[in-house]
């Protein structure tokens, strides 16, 4: 008989500061040794459920509870945070916020030191988990100096060392390149099997998590459980798209091909789908006019070093008017440093030419009138309380006349679909709307290039679509879009040029489909092909032709 380890029985929770409950009537049992994926759109309540589990609620965030919530048969909210920490270990989305020690070894030992573990036992357990997670060469390094994938391994080792029976992962893929994300999912699966833990994963990137099997998926929206069952059962419905979660790309493509998925029993595993070779016929030549574009911003022999360590190495890049460019590569490849160089946040060697004119001497303010840099988190860019004031801030700092400010701000707000909210407080906006405000604040300065760092990271399908369709509108109006991204589907859907960076060098400049069909290049850059390419192998069709078919359906291109 299965043993219940976590139980919510008609459980509701309301934050002290809110009038309506965030969780409503939750009935959910997690059994010992299960691996469960929890999905839902932004604001659905899934993170609140996780915070109830690990003790952040009620120890940090207070509120009112109704119903029962049990961990191993005990009332969870009656436990001390110390006792609960020995039952539930959490790996946070922001790994940097989880590090305590000055070295990897110190960080791994932290929980054991708190438990006054004997020194010999402490050293043995640190060595055991460092060896298991391939961290032995890194024990003397600072956690903050590691790559994204290495940081995730350190965070995971830091909680595994306590050997808690329940592991909770809060969006473990949010800041990782595709290959590192795949490696972490495989590592979580390995630990789950070897240690027999009960594993809960909260994540937007459903297809990436399903790279390894899960026992169940729980879909939450508006604080209620809408689905609780197997991945195959969920994928056979349209609940994902109805609730703002992106379904696996291979399923979208199969639907476009007219394949009847209702009869399929193993939708979560592409390899086991019953579709056969030769079932689909595609013509292979994609005809799409590519107009000759004019050079806008050219970099020549740009290099940058930090503490004598080269970060950018002799980069040559020509950004042309009206392009949509994706900059991709593994964590630490130099993508963000390149963005800082484009924005004049750092001083580098080399030449910067804007429509043929040397602009290397631009100040940050002058460069912002050419290249608008939008950070991943809009809350890190927002400086005022009201929408109008935020968009007007850059003009006011430049001493522009107030009447001209009003004219330019109103015009920009209309372009960004924010005019009706002009007198609203920013706190009342959704994440996607806040992103629009930050883009408006750079557009009002006249920026022709919009440079975005991970424009959709951590966003559900609704926010993702809202942000990207808005960028498409700006592109249609003549803006050049440059995006740093780890999302291969975003690159495929929304860019026409891919720049691949590895160790500070630009190793490829190609179109997205060609990149995704080049295994050697993908390995070098820690990227991975989309599931369209795996589907093409299964159907025995040209992956470029299948990708072209998918994009035709999406963009209205013509196939011949």
Swiss-Prot record:
Which keywords fit this entry according to its UniProt record?
A: ATP-binding, Cell membrane, Membrane, Nucleotide-binding, Repeat, Translocase, Transport
Entry's Gene Ontology cellular component terms = ATP-binding cassette (ABC) transporter complex
Binding, ATP 2: 329-336
Q: Which Gene3D superfamilies match?
A: P-loop containing nucleotide triphosphate hydrolases
The protein's location, in the record's own words, is: Cell membrane
Any one Gene Ontology MF annotation carried by this entry is: ATP hydrolysis activity
**EC number(s) stated in the UniProt entry for this protein:** 7.-.-.-
Xref: SMART domains: AAA
Q: Which residues cross the membrane?
A: none
Q: InterPro entries under this entry? A: AAA+_ATPase, ABC_Co_transporter, ABC_transporter-like_ATP-bd, ABC_transporter-like_CS, ABC_transpr_CbiO/EcfA_su, ECF_ABC_transporter_ATP-bd, P-loop_NTPase
Q: What's its membrane topology?
A: Peripheral membrane protein
Q: Which domain of life is it from?
A: Bacteria
What are the residue boundaries of the ABC transporter domain, all occurrences included? 6-247, 297-528
The residues that hold ATP 1 are: 40-47
Please report which protein family the annotation says this sequence is part of: Belongs to the ABC transporter superfamily.
* Its job: Probably part of an ABC transporter complex. Responsible for energy coupling to the transport system.
| Record's protein name | Putative ABC transporter ATP-binding protein spr0430
